[in-house]
Amino acid sequence: RDMEPDVIFFSDAGPGVRWVGNERGVAGETNWNTITPDTLFAGKAGIEKLLNTGSENGTHWIPAEVDVSIRKGWFYHAEEDSLVKTPQQLFDLYLTSVGRGSTLLLNVPPDRRGLVHENDVAALEGFRALLDSTFKTDFALNKKVIASSYRGNSKHYAPANLTDNNASTYWTTDDEILTGNFE
């Protein structure tokens, strides 16, 4: 961290992100971004379920990273050119990773030319089209939001900021309020 203070370390126990416990591209249906890493270490047997779900009352914020390859394996093999995941399969992986609060690390290996193979490119373009069409409408945009409280009752921190499509506005509570909710 001395040389790169913003580095994110990856391992079973974090400290930045944790392995999700499989290489299928699937986070647990319930996936807490918190976990208690005290007894975890890389390669420890029998912790896959814990890594896949995290801990509701975990002591550290260590979100899961889901890793999967667009192909059967991690490296390019010409005989797998017809086995590239389809756009729909990639979209399903997105929903079972990002849709469950994880990051998605999608391996796309270069071919023997040092390029991304045409079949992989086509699958990625189809995946992008599915994402764009699925999420083109922001159903929360400018909807009314009610919150338990907001800082100083100031419009600068009001719940309406959650749906105003402005990345520089936000909702927050007063400093002494440690939990809050909105609907």
Q: Where are each of the predicted segments found?
A:
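Mature catalytic domains of secreted/periplasmic carbohydrate-active enzymes
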Residues: 1-161, 166-178
